[in-house]
C-alpha cells in the first residue's frame, strides 16, 4: 500500500441520478418554440440560478398538447393516400427518436392492458405490420424516476448501441400511451342503470370510434393543417393582394410585402408538431418546404443592419422588423435545415453561413450596446429593466444556438461553416468578461444560457471533425486568458457534489471525452457475438485483441495529445508569471482551472478529468526536475503538484473496497496487484455501465460518458493481460474481456442498478485507483520529498509546506523513518522559513503520534532560542501543544523554563506570546477542568492530585536558587496581573488562591509526617520558594491564616539551606504584612520579638528582608522608640568598635544595620532631640539623616578596602531615603572624591544607587502613563500590585525635585566613560544608567549621541543591542538634533580604536556606521541617509590650505573614514555616486599640486603624508566603483532595490610609515590613471552609471 497510509473515509450523499442532476445545475434556455414575443421565454420556476429546473404549469400544458387535440374521426382507412400517410408516420415514430424541443421527464412505458390482444385487434392491417414483435410481448416495468432524466433531451441515439438493439425512442409506446390518456371503455358490469345498459347493447362497435382510430384522425388532421399552412404562405408570397391575409404585412419604410411574425410562429409550431409524428421529408413536399425556406432567407437578407440595435427591442412587432423577428426567423430556417434530409445532403453552406453572420452581428452590435445601456443607466430601476431585457435577448439567442447544436450534430458541415461556428465562442466569452468587468455586482448567469448550447456544439464539432481539433483547442485556450480571476465571479457552474467551478473548466473535459471511440466493436473487428465467442475458444483471441488494443491506443494517444496541448499551453505561460508581478492573471487562472478539475475528478459525469490532471502532473514533474528552469517556476510547479497530490490522497479510501466486497490490492503502485480483485471489479463495472446507459440514453450531450468509461476499462483489462504471467489469472482476465465484448454487442439496457442506500460514485472512484494518476502517486510524493535537499531555500520551504499539507503525512513519516530524519536535519537550515516549516511539520507529527514526543521534543525546543522571530513564535506555539499532550513532568518543567526565558525577549511580540502561553498552561480554568467556584477543601482526592500535577512545573521553577530566575518569575506574574481587565482579573485571582491553598495544604502534610528525609526537605523547600515568588507578585491574595502557618518557620538557621529557607519566610512576611488590615497586636508583638532574635545572626540577604519587615512592624505598632533605641545602640557599638582592632565583621554588620534602618525606618517621626541622644559622636545639627551622613563621612576618611565600600553603600541608602541629600554639598563633595579616585568597585556602588533612584522615577513615570491611558474608561484597573514606594523606602517624588536630573548632568562624563570600560559589570551599569537618562530625557541627547554610535560597534552583543535601541529612539524622537553629530562620532570611534602608531586599515571590513545606516534607512527617506554620508565625508574634503597641516594621525583618521564609507551596504546607487563625486572633486583640487611635489621628488614629511592620503582616496573610489559595478559613462540609473556588493575582498590602504620613493611613484601612477581634469578644465555635469 502507498506508504501504508490511513486514508480518510468520506461520508457521501447517495443518489441514483447524480450524472443527470450534475449536468442540470447550470440554467439552460428553454427549448419551447417562440410564440408571443417577449412572453415566449419560459423562465425556470426555481428562483435560484444554480438549482435544477422544474417544469411549470405552462410547460406541462404544452406536453399534453396532442391529447387535447384528439377528435373522433373515421373508423377505418379506405383510401391509399391516407394509408400511405399512416404508414410513413407510424414507421417514423417507431424508428426515429423524439424531438428534443419538447422536454419530457421520462419515456412512458407500455401498460400490460394496452398490449393485450383486445387492444391490438382494433389496429388496422398496416398499423399491425409496423409494430415490432418485441412490442407485442412487452412486460410491465418499473417507471424510472422522473428527476433522473435530463430536461434537455436531444434527438440522437447512443452510438454505443448496434442497429439490432432496441429502438432509440419508444414511439409505439408513446402512441399507446396517448390512447390510454383518453377515458377508458367501461364494461357492461360498470353500467349502473338498465336503460344505459340497453343503449350500450343497441349501438354497433363501428358507430363508436376506437382510441386508435381517433389518434389516426389526429395524425391526418395535423398533416393537413401543416400542408395547408405551407400552401397559404406560398400563395400569399406569389399574390399581389395580401391585405386580407395575416401571414404577410407591409412595412412603413418600403412598399414591399414581408412575412409576419405570426406566420413564423405558426410555421414553427406546425413543423414541430409534425416532426414529432414522423419524418417530415416523407410527409411534406420537398419543393414546398424549400420555397418556405427561400422566403425566410429572403426576409433575413433584406433586413438592414439597424435592425440589430437594442433600441428596437421595444418597438411594435407589426411596425418594424426587430430582434425578436430576426431570431424567430433564424431559428425557423435552422429548424427546416435540421428536419429535411435533402438539406443534409446538399449541405446548404450559403444558408448556414448567412445565419451565422446574423448571430455574429448580434454579438458584435446588439449585446455590447445592451451592456453599455446598463452601465449608463442612472437609476436602479432603469438598470434592473435593462438587465431583464438583456436576459430575454440572450435566452432567445440561446434557443437559436440550441437548434444550431442539433444541426452540427446531424448534418455534415463544410470547413468554412465549422470555422464560423467556432468563432462564435470567443465573442461570447468576450461579452461575458465585459459584462463581469463593467458590472461586477450584477448577476451574469444570463450568459450561461449561451455557453451551454455553444459548448455542446463545440463538443460535437470536436468529435465529428478531427482535423479541426487543433483549431478549436487554440481558440479555446486563447480566450482562456481573458477570463476574470475573481473566484466569486467566475465560478458560476455548480457540480452535482455542490461545489462551484467556472463554466470554462467543463469545456476542456467535454473536448477530451469527445476524443474517445464511440463504438469500439461496431465495426469489422467483431461482426457478431458468435464470432467473438468462437475466437475465444479457438485460441485466436490474442491476435484479435491486438487489433482492438491498437485502436484503443490510438484513441488514448489522441486524448493525451489534446490534454497535453492544453496543459503545455497553460503551464508555459503561467509558470513564467511571478507572484510579485502586477499581472499574474494567467497563473491565477491556471490554478483555478486545476482546482476545478480536482473538484470534478471524483464525478462519473466528468470521467475525462483524470486524463487532463495526469498530463498536468507529468508536465509539472518535468518542470521541477529540469535544472534549466528558474527557481520561481519550480516553486509555482510545486504549488500545483501539491494540489494534485493532496486531492489524490484525499480520494484514497480503503473502506470502499470493504464496502463493495472487493479484495484490496496489496500494492497500489503496481497494476499486477489488481489481478485478484479483477472479477469483482468487472462485475461492478458492468453495473456501472448499465447505470450510465440508463441515465444518459437519448441525450446526445451525454453520449461520450459511457463509451469513455467503457474504453478506459477495456484498456485496463488489456493492459493487465499483457503483464499477467499466471495462466489461471489469464483465464479470468480473458473471461472478463469476453463478457465485456458480449455486453457491448448486446447493449447496456435496463433500469439503474443503484438503490437509495448505495452510492454510484464509489465504483467510479475505485476505477480511478488503477489509473496512471493513482499508480504514480508514490512517485509524486517521493519527488516532493526529494526537494528537501534542494540548494535553494525557497524550494526547501515549499517542499516542507507541501508535505505538511498532506493529510496522511504523519503515517508516511511513521513508516519511513529516513524521511523523518531528513526533515529533522533541516531544523538547522540557514533559511528561517525552512526552520519554521520544519517545526510546524514536526508538531503535526508528534500530535498524531504522541509516543514520539521524547524523541522529537528536543528539536522543537531548540527553536525557542532561534535568532529568527518567526521560528521562535512557531516553537512557542508547538511547545504549548506538547505541554498539553505529554504526561512527562520533566518535559513540562523544561518547556515552562524555556518559555519563561522568552518572557523578556527583545522582541515584544515574543514576550507577550510567551506570557500568554504560560498563563494558559498554569492558570487557565480549562487547563485543570475544575470548578473555579469550589474551594480546595471541596475538591476530591483525584482533583487535588490533578491540581498538584498541574502546579508541579511552577514549584520546580521556583525552587531554583537563582535570583535572576526569581526576578523573572515575579516580573512575569506581575505582567500577567497588570495586563488583565477587571473581568479576567477575577478568574486569575481565583486560580492563584487555589494554588496558594494547594501549597499550604501540602506544607501542612509535610510537617505532619513522622520522618523528614531529604526528599521531604526538598518538597518543603520547593513550597516555600514558590510562596516567596507569589508573595512578591500577589501579596494581597494571602490570608492571615497563612501567616500563622508560616510563623513557626522563623527559626534560627545555621546552614546555608536553613538561611535560604529563613530568607524566604521573612521575605513573605515583609510582602504580605502591609496588606493584612485586621491583625491582632499580640501576633505582631510576637512576630517582632522573633524577628529581633534573628536579627543578629541573619545573613546579609536575610538581613535586608528582616529590617524592612521590622520597620513595617514599628510603624504598625507605632513603636518608634524601639527604632530609635536600635539605631542609637548600633551607633554606640560602632563607635566602640572603630577604636578597637580586629572588629571588621562587627563594624560591617553595624554599618549595614544603621544604613538599613535609616532607609526603611522613618527617623523623622521620632520626636526626640537627636543632637542630645547622639552627643557621643558630636553632631552639628538635629536632623537624624544629616547626622548619620556626616558620621559616615568621617568613617570614610579612615576606612580602607571593603569597609570603605560598605560605608559608601550605606551613605547611598541614607540618601535614597532623603533624596535631596544627594545634591547636598556634603554628599556632592564625597561623590566627587569617589569619582576622582576612579575605583571601579566604589563607583559601581554609587552607580547602583543611581540606578535605584532612576528606577523609582521610572516607576512613577510608568504609573502616570498607566493612569493617563486608563482615563475615561469604565473598567479602570485597580492597582492592587506591590507597593513599590514601600519596597524602595520612599514615597517622595524625587523627579519633581530635580535630584535625578542634577545628578545625571553632574556625573554624565563619568557615566559615558564607564560604558567603554573593560570591566563588563561596570560597563553594563553605565549603559543601564545611560538608557534611563535617554528614556527620561534628563540631559540633552546631543551630549550622549556620539557615545551611543560608538557603542554600536562594541564587541559585546548586549551592549550593541542597547545602543541600537537608543539610537532608534533618538532618531525617531530627535532626528533634527542629532543629524550633524556623525562626524563627531567618527572621531570618538577612531580615538577608541587607536591602538598603535601606524594602524593598518582595509577596505571592505565591517563599518562602525553600518548599524547607524540601517537605522536611518528604516524611515525610507533618502535625505537622512545623505546627511549621514555627508557627515562621514567631511574629513575627506581637503584643499590646498590643509596640506601643510598633515600629520600621521590625520592620515590615519582619513583612512578610517574611508573604511567606514566602504563597508556600508547602500540602499540606493546615488549614495556611492555621491562618494565618487566627492573624491573626484578633492582629486581635482589638490591632486595636481601633490603630483607636482612627487615629480620633483620633494620628500618633505607633510607632502609625503598628503600623497599617502591621495592614494587612499583613489583606492576608495576604485573599490566603490568595482563593488557596485559603476562605469564612467552615460547617466546614473536610479535603483530602488537594495544593492549587493559584488566584491567583498579586502583592499589594504597605505599607512603613514610607507617609504617616500614608493609613495611618489604610486601617486604619479594612480593620478595619471584616473585622468582627473583640474580646475576649469573639469567637465561639468559628468556622471556615472551602473553597468
Swiss-Prot record:
HEAT repeat locations: 775-812, 814-851, 853-888, 890-927, 1101-1140, 1183-1220
A Pfam family matched in the record: Nipped-B_C
Gene Ontology CC terms, in alphabetical order: cytosol; heterochromatin island; nuclear chromosome; nucleus; Scc2-Scc4 cohesin loading complex; SMC loading complex
Localization per Swiss-Prot or TrEMBL: Nucleus; Chromosome
Residues found modified as Phosphoserine: 183
Region (Disordered) location: 140-172
Protein's UniProt keywords contain Cell cycle: yes
Biased composition (Polar residues): 147-162
Ranges of Low complexity composition bias in the record: 163-172
Gene Ontology biological process terms, A to Z: chromatin looping; establishment of mitotic sister chromatid cohesion; establishment of protein localization to chromatin; mitotic sister chromatid cohesion; mitotic sister chromatid segregation; regulation of gene expression; replication-born double-strand break repair via sister chromatid exchange
Alphabetized GO MF terms: ATPase activator activity; chromatin binding; cohesin loader activity; double-stranded DNA binding; single-stranded DNA binding
Keywords from the UniProt entry: Cell cycle, Chromosome, Nucleus, Phosphoprotein, Repeat
Predominant location category: nucleus
Subunit structure: Interacts with ssl3.
Family (UniProt): Belongs to the SCC2/Nipped-B family.
Function text: Plays a structural role in chromatin. Chromatid cohesion molecule required for equal sister chromatid separation in anaphase. May form a stable link between chromatids in S phase that is split rather than removed in anaphase. Also required for spindle-kinetochore interaction in early mitosis and inhibit sister chromatid separation until the cleavage of Rad21 in anaphase.
UniProt-listed PANTHER family: NIPPED-B-LIKE PROTEIN, NIPPED-B-LIKE PROTEIN DELANGIN SCC2-RELATED
Record-given protein name: Sister chromatid cohesion protein mis4
Species for this entry: Schizosaccharomyces pombe (strain 972 / ATCC 24843)
Name of encoding gene: mis4
